[in-house]
């Protein structure tokens, strides 16, 4: 009921807080950071209405360490946006945080940026510019490595500087990590937005979110569209440590 319009009250859904490792010869990136080591403290920074029940798992840093990953390979964490459940795990990652100017400003001043301000203190904030052309229907882009393997596209709407991250693998597979344009694959498959109240509470510009959602829906036959919080959306992506990492894995 609360994920998309038209849901049933008794529907039960698992919401994920995830991080995705994308490897590249010129340096690796994490897309978002999931839950962190100081999760309880981060939850206390939230308004009570936003304190949903959660299950604690291993942090992205713990999972990287468990497989012997060399963290010095990380260029940083590329955040789809700075809401708490996407940045909490930055608390144990001393690496640059990649974000847009609009998102940095939002995170530094908005009430929804309290956890971001806590975990980003003392860390490098690496802003990137919209220096590339429209990309797959989105109005502007930034090519991280200059080879089309990781392209960030301007989305906005959920937050002022929220983005979609497109990853193209050597196999030809393509993924679109759409952040919170929708929380569940139902939003893509049923072309369904969030319920009205959730749009009011969660989005800074619900109309722009709808535009981004429609753009994502149009790509679903050529791109694996991955809403951040739908566990099943990550099924095609190997879990870190389960197979040799080649291009991307989810901690």
Predicted segments, located by residue:
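Conserved beta-strand hairpin/beta-sheet module of binuclear metal-dependent hydrolase folds
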Residues: 1-62, 164-179
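Active-site metal-binding motif and surrounding structural segment of the metallo-beta-lactamase
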Residues: 44-99
